[in-house]
């Protein structure tokens, strides 16, 4: 059973703005916001003000820490060389087996 040979299920809903029932040139619709919601505007008197910081003092910065001490890099230790040789041997062994 192929889904390509079946008729469409239905007509898609109408697209676009505004939806049916709203006049095209009226936004927001009449009666908005619904009753019970306060009208938006300025905050009430006494609301904490979010102004600029006080002038005359620099803003606080994070403390400055000295850079970490640099470690002297030693020459490669024998452990590194032994690890490389072991990996090389493993690769050769696997290559010989497979």
Swiss-Prot record:
Span list, region Disordered: 1-77
Annotated Pro residues bias: 9-21, 56-70
GO terms (BP aspect): megasporogenesis
Principal cellular location given in the protein's record: membrane
Gene inactivation effect: No visible phenotype under normal growth conditions, but flowers of the double mutants wih1-1 and wih2-1 have defect in megasporgogenesis. Doubl mutant plants display retarded growth, and twisted leaves, siliques and roots.
Compartment(s) of residence: Membrane
Coiled-coil positions: none
PANTHER family: CYSTM DOMAIN-CONTAINING PROTEIN, RCG49325, ISOFORM CRA_A
Protein name: Cysteine-rich and transmembrane domain-containing protein WIH2
């Amino acid at each position: 059973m192929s889904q390509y040979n079946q008729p469409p299920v239905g007509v898609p809903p109408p697209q676009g703005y505004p939806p049916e029932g709203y006049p095209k040139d009226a936004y927001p619709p009449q009666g908005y916001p619904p009753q019970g919601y306060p009208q938006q505007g300025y905050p009430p008197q006494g609301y904490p003000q979010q102004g600029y910081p006080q002038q005359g003092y620099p803003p606080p910065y994070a403390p400055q820490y000295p850079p970490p001490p640099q470690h002297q890099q030693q020459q490669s230790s024998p452990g590194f060389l032994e690890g490389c040789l072991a990996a090389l041997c493993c690769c050769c062994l696997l290559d010989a087996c497979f």
